[in-house]
Design a protein with these regions (language model features):
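Post-signal-peptide, soluble extracytosolic/periplasmic N-terminal scaffold domains
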Residues: 2-11, 18-19, 27-297, 626-702
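Structural motif
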Residues: 67-70, 83-84, 173-177, 300-308, ...
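A short, solvent-exposed loop/turn motif at the edges and junctions
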Residues: 118-120, 164, 761-775, 847-860
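Extracellular beta-sheet/turn segments enriched in Thr/Pro/Gly and aliphatic residues
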Residues: 155-159, 366-369, 774-795, 859-878
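Transmembrane beta-strand segments that form the barrel wall of outer-membrane beta-barrel proteins
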Residues: 162, 181-199, 220-232, 261-265, ...
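Exposed, low-structure sequence patches enriched in small/polar residues
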Residues: 511-517, 522-818, 823, 827-833, ...
Length: 878
């Protein structure tokens, strides 16, 4: 095998991006020829490639005249990375046609393709008169536009003057590229169970099954959740199993409104009113449809440039924005939201080197909206709750938030029902150095279960401030119910003034309720104060404090919660010290816990280049004390196994004693496996009195036009990998996900309205499988099942030595298989590499435009070639 073809073969079996035309060896030789040709004296201005630089016999070299015109590649379809004005747009298959003598080959881009990249087609004279599928002569229709193909990088560089571009935010993906997915049915299953041996209370068994089914048709998504439970114990006669329907809903996106329509069971957001479950209809904004540079709150930057200038924006010392602006006033409204606060330092650098620097204060709270952005929701239906103590009144709710200039936001909403009416209005402000604040008030009229009517007001405020110099973040949330007559909507749905949120009678068995399940409308909430503070200590430590205090009308009982902790790392050893306190208004006493956790990875003691399996393991120690004398100590190891790290394990052992409980040893062991067809887990725990075995399996089933594919539990948005013939290929960046025996796999999650990269690991392909391209990009809508297709060539990898009239075929000749699925370029000695070839067939060869500059070679391979990594063959081309 020649060196050039050996390199050609290695590149096509190891590279992730497998190109349609394999050109490495060819262009090495061609580059040498170009270098000499450039030094040769010419009698005219035209460039001439002397074939004698490549071979002694000019007839041994294919027609290279196209390269004399600057044409580096023959016309055809190539997969390239498209960059517009130095910004990455997409990776796509682009058809290139023959251009004029100076252009070489030029890309065939349609009007729709250019529009999807941000070109304002209406601003280009005559472009809208072209048919949708006609190639746009970009450089002739737009003055100063350029199109250049970088063959070595397989990158298409386009430049279009800014005057012809639409004003789009960073990260914008045109809705035309959003993929609603395929029609398909899906089923998620999650089964778990345990068996308990209790030396005191006897044996018991429990099982639980959660089924989440769905159907996608076009842009519509139908979803349903149902559960089944089973339990039996020695303390009760017989066993009990129960099916329960949880919810069903139908939804779709409304793209022009950047909104989502939900029919059936859903829930409202808790930004203005308390979130509630409902059965009805909802139309609400979906900010996931916005580019990341338009989500969350960020100030709008205004400035003036004396000339063409470079604008750089920093936050907390990091560059978060960089752009070039034309002379005159400019506006920047596509800054990515970064944290809750941190002033923005804006630098305008002019062409002459002079700079302007100013600071824009920045702090945020959750309700703040960008200038000009509106978020809304409209809901109508009936109140829905799994609590038998609550009724199902019909209601209407609407909310609206709108961003104003100068960092202001106004918002409000209304809730209307037969026994409840509430109106809310509020304002928020980015106060810069003083932080961010939002204040709102709700006026409510309520009728309680005893038919008493109440009027009341609730005032809420939210404050956030970061002290960047000291690394301190303060978030203060305060609720103050100024009158005793304020109730929320859920309070009016109860059928009684007090009781428990669970059934206290199960047949003949009396169920003892928990104090957390108790409610009493006579003691409605009065005021609540929450405070969260985080403090950065050096580079590797963080201190956090969080607490809340809830008071009630008519009683001195209060709810209290407090958490404090210190997280730190010394080299790669992590440890956490934490404290928690919980006090319920109807609880006697309080619950406290002091805990210490230490994790030490085994890699701490291994060389950085160690291949030991222990590099994926860690040792752990934990101690907890309830401050009433009871302490638990646990020590153990955890980590992952197998090549894909898809088998995780954890083993812990320890001792618990003191306080009111029994003393004795305790411990547990677990195994969790994540595979291409689903997940499984098993575990065992023990103490002196109780032994427990628990287990579970979970996964997803996807039924589509090409069959049924099993996978891991499916999230809302998934990707179906279709690579027929490429069985057992690993999907990159996915633990345990491989294609099945047909070449299909399911990626259990994807990010909606964003470009998702899906790639197959070519190192895991069978020896007789090759891919045109191992990477696909998809942009799914929410809830979509999108298909990522890969074209696999299943067949023999063949290194052919072709001769014509007993001489090697010309260097640079194009070779195409009979099915046109594989092609290559002849290197030295008439050798060419082809993949996906059948045992018998023919190849077509062309090395010029003359009538006698082409031939056909037939070949026949032995059956054992199918088991060989590479087969070599010589054939005569006639």
């Amino acid at each position: 095998m020649s060196y050039l073809n050996l390199r050609l073969y290695q590149r096509n079996t190891q590279c992730l991006h497998i190109r349609k035309h394999r050109l490495a060896g060819f262009f090495v030789r061609l580059f040498v020829a170009c270098a000499f040709a450039a030094q040769a004296p010419l009698s005219s201005a035209e460039l001439y490639f002397n074939p004698r630089f490549l071979a002694d016999d000019p007839q041994a070299v294919a027609d290279l005249s196209r390269f004399e015109n600057g044409q580096e590649l023959p016309p055809g379809t190539y997969r390239v990375d498209i960059y517009l004005n130095n910004g990455y747009m997409a990776t796509r298959d682009v058809t290139f046609n023959t251009g004029d003598s100076e252009q070489g080959i030029v890309p065939c881009l349609t009007r729709a393709q250019l529009a999807s990249m941000g070109l304002n087609t209406a601003s280009v004279s005559g472009m809208n008169l072209l048919a949708d599928d006609v190639c746009v002569p970009l450089t002739s229709m737009i003055h100063d536009a350029t199109a250049h193909l970088d063959v070595g990088q397989q990158r298409l560089n386009l430049t279009i003057p800014q005057a012809f571009m639409s004003n789009r935010a960073r990260g914008y993906i045109p809705p035309e590229l959003w993929d609603p997915g395929i029609n398909a049915g899906l089923l998620n299953y999650n089964f778990s169970g345990n068996s308990v041996q209790n030396r005191i209370g006897g044996n018991s068994h429990y099982a639980y099954l959660n089924l989440q089914s769905g159907l996608n048709i076009g842009a519509w998504r139908l979803r349903d959740n149902t559960t089944w439970s089973y339990n039996s114990s020695d303390r009760s006669s017989g066993s009990k199993n129960k099916w329960q329907h949880i919810n069903t809903w139908l939804e779709r996106d409304i793209i022009p409104l950047r909104s989502r329509l939900t029919l059936g069971d859903g829930y409202t957001q808790g930004d203005i009113f308390d979130g509630i479950n409902f059965r009805g209809v909802q139309l609400a904004s979906d900010d996931n449809m916005l580019p990341d540079s338009q989500r969350g709150f960020a100030p709008v930057i205004h400035g003036i440039a004396r000339g063409t200038a470079q604008v750089t924006i920093k936050q907390n010392g990091y560059d978060i924005y960089n752009s070039t602006v034309p002379p005159g006033p400019f506006t920047i409204n596509d800054i990515y939201a970064a944290g809750n606060s941190g002033d923005l330092q804006v630098t305008i650098k002019e062409a002459d080197g002079s700079t302007q620097i100013f600071t824009v204060p920045y702090s945020s709270v959750p309700l703040l909206q960008r200038e000009g952005h509106t978020r809304y929701s409209i809901t109508a239906g009936e109140y829905r709750s799994g609590n038998a103590q609550q009724e199902k009144p019909r209601f209407f709710q609407s909310t609206l938030l709108h961003g104003l200039p100068a960092g202001w936001t106004i918002y409000g909403g209304t809730q209307l029902a037969d026994r409840y009416r509430a109106f809310n209005f509020g304002i928020g402000k980015n106060m810069g150095a003083l932080g961010a604040l939002s204040v709102d008030m709700t006026q409510a009229n309520s009728t309680l279960p005893d038919d008493s009517q109440h009027d009341g007001q609730s005032v809420r405020f939210l404050y956030n401030k970061s002290l960047n110099e000291s690394g301190t973040n303060i978030q203060l949330v305060g609720y103050r119910y100024s009158t005793s007559g304020y109730f929320n909507f859920a309070d009016t749905t109860y059928s009684r003034m007090n009781g428990y949120n669970i059934e206290t009678q199960d047949g003949v068995i009396q169920v003892k309720p928990k104090f957390t399940d108790y409610y009493n409308l006579a003691y409605n909430k009065r005021g609540k104060l929450q405070l969260t503070v985080t403090q950065q200590l050096g580079r590797s430590s963080t201190l956090y404090l969080s607490g809340s205090h809830q008071t009630y009308w008519g009683t001195s009982n209060v709810d209290e919660q407090f958490q404090a902790g210190l997280n730190t790392a010394f080299e790669d050893i992590n440890w956490t010290l934490s404290y928690s306190l919980t006090k319920n208004a109807w609880q006697k006493g309080r619950d406290q816990m002091l805990a210490l956790n230490v994790n030490i990875p085994f890699s701490h003691w291994l060389r950085s280049d160690s291949k030991s399996q222990w590099r994926h393991a860690s040792a752990s120690y934990s101690m907890s004390h309830d401050l009433n004398g009871r302490m638990t100590n646990l020590a153990g190891v955890y980590g992952t196994l197998l090549e894909d790290n898809n088998l995780s394990y954890s083993v812990q052992t320890g001792y618990a004693g003191g306080g009111d409980g029994n003393s004795g040893s305790t411990g547990y062991a677990t195994l969790n496996y994540r595979g291409g067809y689903g997940n499984a887990n098993i575990g065992y725990s023990h103490s002196d009195d109780i032994k427990q075995l628990y287990y579970g399996v979970s996964g997803g089933v996807l039924a589509h036009a090409n069959g049924v594919t099993l996978g891991q539990p499916l999230n809302d948005t998934v990707v179906l990998v279709k690579a027929p013939g490429a069985k057992d290929a690993k999907v990159e960046n996915q633990t345990g996900v491989r294609t099945d025996w047909r070449g299909y796999a399911v990626l259990p999650y994807a990010t909606e309205y964003r470009e998702n990269r899906v790639a197959l690991d070519t190192n895991t392909l069978a020896d007789n499988v090759d891919l045109d391209n191992a990477v696909a990009n998809v942009v799914p809508t929410r809830g979509a099942i999108v298909r990522a297709e890969f074209k696999a060539r299943v067949g023999i990898k063949l290194l052919m030595t072709l001769t014509h009239n007993n001489k090697p075929l010309p260097f640079g000749a194009m070779v195409t298989s009979e099915s046109s699925q594989s092609s290559g370029i002849v290197a030295d000695n008439g050798q060419v590499y082809l993949s996906g070839m059948p045992l018998a067939g023919k190849v077509q060869v062309k090395w010029g435009e003359e009538e006698n500059a082409h031939c056909i070679a037939n070949y026949q391979l032995p059956p054992e070639s199918q088991q060989q990594l590479l087969t070599q063959l010589s054939a005569e081309c006639r």
